[in-house]
Amino acid sequence: MAVSFELTEDQRELQGWVHQFAKDVVRPAAAEYDEREDFPWPVLQEAAKIGLYSLDFFATQWFDESGLGIPLTMEELFWGDAGIGLAIVGTTLAAASVTANGTEEQVGRWVPAMFGTVTEPTVAAFCSSEPDAGSDVGAMRTRAVYDEATDEWVLDGTKAWATNGGIADIHVVTAVVDPELRTRGQASFVVPPGTKGLSQGQKFKKHGIRASHTAEVVLDQVRVPGRCLLGGKDKLDARLAKAREGTRAGGNASMATFERTRPAVAAQAIGIARAAYEVALDYAKTREQFGKPIIENQGIAFMLADMATSIEASRLLVWRAAWMARQGKRFEKAEGSMSKLFAGETAVKVTERAMQILGGNGFTREYPVERMARDAKIYTIFEGTSEIQRLVIARSVSGAPIR
């Protein structure tokens, strides 16, 4: 079977289209919204106007046969700016959860509503992490109790680090329905707009990705109709019964979403790394010290060589994992985690080296690499820390119950 790494004409057009938007709209607004730590609604509206923020675009790229539509989009958008990029794509994590775990009726009802309209775009939030349950999803405390008399689920708890939390129209919340089963006793629920009892808690002031809204979501006796349980109650009851019998019945809803989205998140990190590398490369070619461009110094040139190599290697890991996921192939060696681990750590290393190459200029806000370095760090933390990725990979390659 022939192997080709050439992008199709359609893929190159997609790449160029998103890149142009990132160059013309995202980059000019990046420093302002980083400084303000505010959600970039005007940029989201521009994305909606051209169809970049829409259900049609999400569906087209999500179901792209090659699996590369989402990674290509992510890399170019986050090349523009990571904070604004997350503001634009944050809704897709909630949409991905409903698409992966919901019934056909639920997907048709809730996913379109997440994006709003061209003139009035809205956002959605996926709420999984908690103050005491980040990587350890088994420590989740948010509870969902079924009220049979009213056919409603009652949700109580606090979610942390929720992208778009509190400002979203629709929240997708993961909760424990059977505490004894730990991760296998969890389910996800859609909380519709205007539901009583849901409120925004603390809005976090962050080191990076400041244009992305990140906050706590407080759930106080939140009642949602039975139809808001993703997958439906019959499916949940069957899964819980198998879990109680000790029979494997698939992973929990949060982890299923994370596994499917890790290559996309890794592609975001590549966009940040590539942007910083390009700034450093251009700077090294024009900055002169001791009578010659600093790129002619081996110490600088070798740093750039390592940066370029790591970016290219990261992209290949991402493309492979994204293709495997789209083809329905199992991640036998935790390929999704490999892509997230390597790309996330590459972003941190590349942005730090870019700052070093720019010297004192790199440490100022007159140049964008200090912002890129702040943004990059989150990619070794969220959607599974680097340590968790290594744990997943180690378990996969060893077959041992490593802790």
Question: Model features per residue range: what roles?
Answer:
Residues 27-35, 281, 285-292, 308-342, ...:
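C-terminal helix-coil-helix/basic helical segment that borders enzyme active sites and/or dimer interfaces
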Residues 120-129:
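A short, Trp-centered hydrophobic/proline-enriched beta-strand micro-motif
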Residues 3-14, 199-312, 379, 395-401:
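Glycine-rich beta->alpha junctions and the first turn(s) of the following alpha-helix
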Residues 152-202:
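A short core secondary-structure module
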